[in-house]
């Protein structure tokens, strides 16, 4: 099935009342016409429409599309990206287990691992985003490897297949956060990953007005996560938000191509600027990671980072406050142009004082270059 079919028509063959736009089924309950119909639905509660905390027609349509985009058998929408991360982690770990996690993973993912370590005696090894180092960290107690590639602050790329081949031989589960590349540009399932998670808050919804997460994988894993973690913890996504994600999916491929086009222009400018020490954007052909990145991804997103040639926090502050088009804000993945200086966080190590992350949006890239240029002249 090609991407156009998935985004525009898959699962929408029988829309009620011949509507061209799939409806929002904003209801808590679903009724039954007979005892047998009700009994069948209650016995097959995973996919039947019974109660909002389970499945919903609007939500289920979007889940089918997301599973198809990721080349997975099934997917589940949840209330946030962190919900997707925590549910998938909880499912594969038990007290006394060991997990390997890339040390540049999303900070709240690491905080969750630290919480599990203290509360449930789970051992966590944080290792650099390098396949060989990850494989070397495996022990006899390892049950899960948690990946992020590219990582979301320094955009480091991992040889995913090298990790999954080693994990598969040892029957270790792998989970990856695929938010940076989106399912348009990277399909980790085809590289051997067991479960793929996303913050759908970002590119998948794409308009900066939805918070959601995605978990995708094999039917068996998805069914078990749904029954064991999802139904017990209850991170339910509203059908209205699922419908907004559906709206965002219509333009996902177009938006990702534009983000990539703009990011190449901006990263080229930064790579050539005398006040910039380093640019982290793996899908630029000039990047030292391009060969590996392009073997796993067909394009890049709008997220990158760079280092200024300074170790002064004041200079970094002056730079970001001089920007006019880029706005200081966390998160990323919609049309906006955003900037986050690493030093704004209280836990910033000295070596990262000059590290700045930007998200390149959907506008004219030359305006972004002009904005960066005028701000760089101020320092």
Curated annotation (Swiss-Prot):
Organism this protein belongs to: Thermotoga maritima (strain ATCC 43589 / DSM 3109 / JCM 10099 / NBRC 100826 / MSB8)
Residue list for modification N6-(pyridoxal phosphate)lysine: 202
BP GO terms, sorted: peptidoglycan biosynthetic process; regulation of cell shape; transsulfuration
EC number: 5.1.1.1, 5.1.1.3
Reported temperature dependence: Optimum temperature is 70 degrees Celsius for the cystathionine beta-lyase activity.
GO-annotated molecular function: alanine racemase activity; carbon-sulfur lyase activity; glutamate racemase activity; pyridoxal phosphate binding
Complex formation: Homotetramer; dimer of active dimers.
Ligand binding (pyridoxal 5'-phosphate): 51-53, 81-82, 199-201
UniProt entry keywords in alphabetical sequence: Cell shape, Isomerase, Lyase, Peptidoglycan synthesis, Pyridoxal phosphate
Gene that encodes the chain: aar
Required cofactor(s): pyridoxal 5'-phosphate
Coiled-coil intervals, chain numbering: none
Catalytic activity: L-alanine = D-alanine; L-glutamate = D-glutamate; L,L-cystathionine + H2O = L-homocysteine + pyruvate + NH4(+)
Function comment: Catalyzes the racemization of L-alanine to D-alanine, and of L-glutamate to D-glutamate. The activity is low, but likely physiological since T.maritima lacks canonical alr and murI genes, while D-alanine and D-glutamate are essential components of peptidoglycan. Also displays a more efficient cystathionine beta-lyase (CBL) activity, cleaving cystathionine to homocysteine and pyruvate; however, this reaction seems not to be physiologically relevant since T.maritima possesses an O-acetyl-homoserine thiolase (MetY) that bypasses the need of CBL for methionine biosynthesis.
Record's protein name: L-alanine/L-glutamate racemase
Enzyme type, top EC level: isomerase
Gene Ontology CC annotations of this record: cytoplasm
Pathway: Cell wall biogenesis; peptidoglycan biosynthesis
Family as reported in the entry's similarity comment: Belongs to the trans-sulfuration enzymes family.
Classification lineage: Bacteria, Thermotogati, Thermotogota, Thermotogae, Thermotogales
């Amino acid at each position: 099935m090609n991407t156009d079919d998935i985004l525009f028509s898959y699962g929408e063959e029988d829309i009620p009342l011949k509507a061209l736009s799939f409806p929002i089924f904003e209801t808590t309950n679903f009724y039954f016409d007979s005892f047998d119909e009700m009994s069948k639905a209650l016995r097959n509660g995973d996919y039947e429409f019974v109660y909002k905390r389970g499945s919903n027609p609007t939500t289920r349509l979007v889940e089918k599309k997301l599973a198809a985009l990721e080349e997975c058998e099934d997917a589940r929408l949840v209330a946030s990206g962190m919900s997707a991360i925590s549910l998938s982690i909880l499912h594969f770990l038990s007290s006394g287990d060991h997990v390997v996690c890339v040390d540049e993973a999303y900070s709240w993912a690491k905080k969750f691992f630290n919480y599990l370590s203290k509360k449930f005696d789970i051992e966590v090894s944080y290792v650099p985003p390098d396949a060989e180092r990850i494989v070397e960290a495996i022990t006899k107690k390892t049950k899960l490897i948690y990946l992020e590639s590219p990582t979301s602050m320094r955009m480091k790329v991992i040889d995913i297949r090298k990790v999954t081949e080693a994990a598969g031989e040892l029957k270790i589960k792998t989970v990856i956060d695929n938010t940076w590349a989106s399912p348009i540009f990277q399909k980790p399932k085809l590289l051997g990953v067991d479960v793929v998670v996303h913050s759908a808050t970002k590119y998948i919804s794409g308009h900066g007005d939805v918070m959601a997460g995605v978990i995708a994988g094999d039917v068996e894993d998805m069914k078990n996560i749904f029954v064991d973690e999802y139904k017990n913890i209850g991170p339910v996504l509203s059908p209205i938000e699922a419908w907004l994600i559906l709206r965002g999916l219509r333009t996902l491929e177009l938006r990702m191509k534009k983000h990539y086009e703009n990011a190449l222009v901006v990263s080229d400018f930064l790579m050539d600027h005398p006040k910039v020490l380093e640019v982290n954007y793996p899908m630029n052909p000039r990047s030292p990671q391009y060969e590996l990145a392009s073997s796993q991804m067909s394009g890049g997103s709008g997220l990158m980072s760079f280092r200024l040639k300074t170790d002064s926090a004041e200079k970094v502050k002056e730079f970001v406050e001089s920007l006019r088009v880029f706005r200081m804000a966390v998160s990323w993945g919609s049309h906006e142009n955003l900037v986050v200086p690493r030093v704004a966080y209280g836990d910033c190590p000295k070596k990262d004082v000059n590290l700045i992350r930007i998200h390149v949006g959907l506008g004219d890239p030359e305006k972004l270059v002009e904005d960066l240029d005028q701000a760089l002249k101020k320092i």
